């Protein structure tokens, strides 16, 4: 998705039927990856056609720290060398957010908000040509609206998101299925180069 979790939204696929958004809700972290997960508490409330999901996470990240400046994150999970151990669990990250979704068989609309901060640290990567538009600062906010309209022949779905700096990203798809053996998918992606989403 544009705000959170890459397996949460449309993506590229050889099969047209596999690009539609999947709403898996909260689930256990099974990967050996030490970075792409949350540690904390989550709750889901279902009422008629409305789902409300809220969560809070606090965890420590590995990173290169100079006083109160974080110049890089260490994401390989290895702590074999002294320099690796010096970066271990240096940066605290607090994340909270939620999603409210209204769903019927032909219509689904949701609102997602996510806020995260890095304690007393400021993220300031060393300036390089490839990271000119990376997130810099202590906190960020992402908000998105996702939508799905469908009937037997046509399906329109997508997500449009905004980051704290005002940059927009949007991912939309139109799927036409005139027959059970034939489907056509049009996918439109727009990402402002300034759009910043740590978990998107």
Name each model-derived stretch:
Residues 1-200:
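Outer-membrane beta-barrel channel domains
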């Amino acid at each position: 998705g544009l705000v959170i979790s890459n397996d949460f939204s449309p993506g590229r696929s050889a099969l047209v039927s596999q690009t539609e958004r999947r709403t898996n809700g909260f689930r256990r972290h099974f990967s050996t990856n030490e970075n792409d997960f949350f540690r904390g508490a989550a709750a889901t409330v279902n009422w008629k056609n409305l789902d409300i999901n809220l969560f809070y996470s606090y965890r420590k990240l590995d990173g290169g720290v100079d006083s109160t400046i974080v110049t890089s994150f260490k994401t390989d999970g290895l702590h074999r060398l002294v320099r690796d151990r010096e970066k271990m669990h240096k940066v605290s990250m607090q994340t909270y957010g939620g999603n409210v979704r209204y769903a019927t068989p032909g219509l689904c609309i949701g609102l997602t908000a996510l806020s995260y901060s890095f304690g007393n640290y400021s993220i300031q990567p060393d300036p390089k040509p490839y990271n000119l538009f990376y997130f810099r600062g202590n906190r960020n906010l992402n908000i998105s609206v996702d939508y799905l309209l469908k009937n037997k022949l046509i399906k329109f779905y997508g997500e449009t998101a905004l980051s704290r700096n005002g940059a927009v990203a949007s991912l939309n798809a139109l799927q036409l299925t005139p027959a059970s053996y034939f489907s056509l998918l049009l996918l439109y992606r727009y990402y402002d180069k300034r759009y910043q989403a740590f978990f998107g």
